[in-house]
Amino acid sequence: MAPKKKVVGLIKLQIQAGQANPAPPVGPALGQHGVNIMEFCKAYNAATENQRGQVIPVEITVYEDRSFTFALKTPPAAKLLLKAAGVGKGSAEPHKNKVAKVSWDQVKEIAETKKADLNANDIDAAAKIIAGTARSMGITVE
């Protein structure tokens, strides 16, 4: 069995799917850990090619020998809610001004998508987490 590589850094980024490039914020974040930036960009773009138009969070683990691995996460709940509600951004005063409405079916659908990344035991608990996010953005859940 090969010896374990020593982890020297963990980088979390949110990048548009299929659009990673060496410009900020990607380049500086990876450069300070000595990672080959173009190699990461090519791998990330290939992995997210089918999800274009969405923001995909990525967790990059950097090892002592400057190699890396990365794990893709599901898109942020806020972005999925904005897309479902059909609005550009949430309310500046969420408890006073409501900007949109989403149905419980839409919330459950988003919860299904996010289930892997949420700390919930079942879909109903995940849906409540998503509904809380919606409420804090000024989106009404019906």
From Swiss-Prot:
Subunit comment: Part of the ribosomal stalk of the 50S ribosomal subunit. Interacts with L10 and the large rRNA to form the base of the stalk. L10 forms an elongated spine to which L12 dimers bind in a sequential fashion forming a multimeric L10(L12)X complex.
Protein's name in the database: Large ribosomal subunit protein uL11
BP term (GO), one: translation
UniProt cross-references to NCBIfam families, sorted A to Z: L11_bact (TIGR01632)
Classification via InterPro entries: Ribosomal_uL11, Ribosomal_uL11_bac-typ, Ribosomal_uL11_C, Ribosomal_uL11_C_sf, Ribosomal_uL11_CS, Ribosomal_uL11_N, Ribosomal_uL11_N_sf
Family according to the record: Belongs to the universal ribosomal protein uL11 family.
Function per UniProt: Forms part of the ribosomal stalk which helps the ribosome interact with GTP-bound translation factors.
Pfam families: Ribosomal_L11, Ribosomal_L11_N
Modification after translation, per record: One or more lysine residues are methylated.
GO cellular component, one term: cytosolic large ribosomal subunit
UniProt keyword list: Methylation, Ribonucleoprotein, Ribosomal protein, RNA-binding, rRNA-binding
Naturally occurring in which organism (per UniProt): Mycolicibacterium paratuberculosis (strain ATCC BAA-968 / K-10)
Gene Ontology MF terms: large ribosomal subunit rRNA binding; structural constituent of ribosome
